[in-house]
Amino acid sequence: NPQQDFMRF
């Protein structure tokens, strides 16, 4: 999910 990947840190 690229839209949620920004929160995968």
Swiss-Prot record:
The keyword Secreted applies. The modification Phenylalanine amide is found at F9. GO terms for cellular component: extracellular region. Keywords: Amidation, Neuropeptide, Secreted. The keyword Secreted applies. It is found in: Secreted. GO terms for biological process: neuropeptide signaling pathway. Detected in the thoracic perisympathetic organs in larvae, and the dorsal ganglionic sheath in adults (at protein level). Belongs to the FARP (FMRFamide related peptide) family. This is FMRFamide-15. It comes from Lucilia cuprina (Green bottle fly). The lineage of its organism: Eukaryota, Metazoa, Ecdysozoa, Arthropoda, Hexapoda.
